[in-house]
């Protein structure tokens, strides 16, 4: 006669088995009280969101240009860059609406430095509370200069700490298909661009636009740090960002294909073109070539191109982050960027394209 095996007794615990440490995270409200938005920053953000809304809906024929470093790792260099970009933005204000790219979070294919919020000291100390404070202070300083800021929303909690200072947001190629990021975009107070998939697929971005325009209910954290259920009304100010895939998609054929896919889904064909990433075949200097092609399309009268994105820093190229070695000033530590001189020339090229588009429209 067989004896029935008794179940093994439960020993120990079943949760947090791979968590090595838990540290307190500052509540968003405490940081917002320590670094409150002032009237100057508020005016910059409000005006910029309204301007982007008008551009996306055809009421403003300027070209939105999101320009700046691949990622922020040095507040001082970022402010120096912002001062230069503010001057260029003022010079081209009639043709371009310039937003500074201020990216604090970096999606990684495997592992690596995850950005200024996650590791502000660049040493693996993960001083996230300090990173949040430094990020918010930098955004305040740039907005006070009258220059609006754009960022990528990657972590689902970080918007509670900085989103009131963001004029335009992006959802990256790796997260465009993520349901949680689509839900987040549906509740953000700023316009949002969704990149096409890493393989070049436009469909995932089109689906993201439709999802983000709809109401959602999801779990999140309030400004006071409490778990809560958020209900959104949907975001009408979302658009596609063409960043290339297996092949570039910045050219006229790529724009046409994306516009057709948007039209087939009943969506307006409003497109931003990322000059970097797969559109530049990961060669940062090709952004100049890509920009020239896009400027020609704009100059020929294409009104579907409403924005561009440029990875640019004080100095060109990139550098490795090596422990114990000083970093060169104003050089990216993530993707390589154009230097300032090439950036200034590229902005002039784009502004000229917008002026030509106006002439074409009046003929």
Which positions does each model-derived feature cover?
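Acidic (Asp/Glu)-rich catalytic clusters
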Residues: 56-59, 86-93, 137-146, 231-232, ...
